[in-house]
């Protein structure tokens, strides 16, 4: 997920991860991300997984969300060059959502009002995106310079399927953008979900406790599900061994600060220097929390088991999160999801900073 710069005076101290971490043996992960950049939440989440010990990132698949996929591919390739991770392939993915399009979203905006964030459909001048509006296939000049490496000559859905079949029941799928690529993989291969080790998603919103008007006024709205509701619906109905959901509710309990960036920059590693040079985004740690919680589940102190889906009706709630308990769920194939509710904030910040200091 995104996003936008907000400052905070919150300070934390970075200390090394405990030797008794859950990262005791190599774990395999596929990263599916809307990798807008440079730096920012999307890139920091990828760095958390890339820099984690005992973790192998099999590849990074790109999907439009915060920005258009062609631009995201270039930002992510360049990030991997600057942080010395060029052994990890970047795979082009879906440019457009399955059904929702820009014209329909503009029409809904005129009828139901404006959302604070439109990602690839938004505009920096209006505060609804991180970059000026541009056409999907246009890649503006990159602040961090253009990459010299190339993306893999394969599409995201087939790459995801191939990797899961190569490592049956060993690969976690980490999805922190709209779920278009994951939905396409599920439609191409009925075994894709069941052959994985599980799914980690940054998405959805249940009942965030906040005065932030973006979520206080629309408590079930969240950008990743909203951008491609049909994809989220497909993914949430698939037979995953386990689904962990990092929602708005828990994400807004975190905050990236200038003090954190100062601590990260003091490491003078390639990752730290990349973030020090290009990070100007001080906001909630959405995607980073989903990544670190997968690396160390102990930072999640409370979760709720809920059945989760997405509203597909064409009205003001199109793309909103739907939830049920076991006694109230519909008979439509919804799956049980581990919905994260609360965290050990200090432990999360320590591990996050250590991972950003990287190598």
Predicted feature descriptions by range:
Residues 104-113, 213-217, 260:
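Short, surface-exposed amphipathic charged segments that create phosphate/polyanion-binding patches used
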Residues 20-24:
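Sec/Tat signal peptide C-region and signal peptidase I cleavage site
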Residues 89-97:
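A short, structured active-site edge motif that brings together acidic residues
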Residues 1-12:
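Bacterial N-terminal signal peptides that target proteins for export
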Residues 25-27, 44-57, 223-359:
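Conformational coupling and interaction surfaces
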Residues 107-126:
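A charged helix-plus-loop insertion that forms the helical arch/lid used to bind
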Residues 25-86, 101, 128-245, 251:
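Active-site histidine-anchored catalytic micro-motif
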């Amino acid at each position: 997920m995104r996003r936008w710069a907000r400052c905070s005076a919150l300070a934390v101290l970075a200390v090394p991860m405990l030797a008794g971490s859950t990262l005791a043996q190599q774990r395999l992960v596929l990263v599916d991300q809307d990798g807008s950049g440079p730096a920012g939440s999307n890139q920091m989440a990828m760095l958390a997984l890339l820099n984690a010990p005992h973790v192998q990132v099999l590849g990074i698949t790109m999907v439009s969300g915060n920005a258009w996929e062609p631009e995201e591919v270039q930002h992510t390739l360049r990030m991997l060059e600057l942080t010395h991770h060029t052994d990890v392939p970047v795979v082009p993915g879906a440019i457009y959502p399955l059904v929702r399009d820009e014209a329909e979203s503009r029409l809904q905006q005129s009828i139901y009002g404006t959302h604070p964030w439109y990602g690839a459909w938004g505009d920096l001048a209006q505060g609804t995106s991180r970059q000026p509006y541009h056409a999907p296939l246009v890649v503006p000049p990159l602040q961090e310079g253009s990459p010299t490496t190339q993306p893999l000559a394969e599409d995201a859905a087939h790459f995801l399927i191939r990797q899961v079949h190569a490592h049956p029941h060993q690969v976690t799928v980490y999805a922190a953008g709209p779920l278009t690529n994951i939905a396409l993989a599920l439609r191409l291969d009925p075994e894709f979900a069941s052959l994985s080790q599980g799914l980690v998603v940054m998405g959805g919103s249940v009942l965030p406790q906040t005065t932030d008007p973006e979520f206080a006024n629309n408590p079930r709205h969240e950008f990743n599900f909203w951008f491609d509701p049909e994809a989220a619906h497909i993914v949430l109905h698939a037979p995953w061994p386990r689904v962990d959901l990092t929602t708005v509710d828990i994400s807004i309990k975190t905050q990236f600060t200038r003090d954190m960036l100062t601590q990260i920059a003091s490491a003078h590693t390639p990752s730290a220097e990349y973030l020090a040079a290009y990070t100007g985004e001080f906001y909630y740690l959405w995607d980073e929390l989903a990544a670190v919680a997968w690396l160390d589940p102990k930072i999640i102190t409370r979760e709720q088991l809920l059945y989760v889906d997405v509203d597909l009706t064409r009205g003001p709630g199109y793309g909103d999160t739907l939830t049920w308990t076991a006694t109230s769920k519909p008979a439509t194939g919804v799956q049980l999801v581990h919905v994260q509710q609360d965290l050990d904030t200090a432990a999360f910040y320590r591990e996050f900073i250590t991972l950003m200091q990287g190598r």
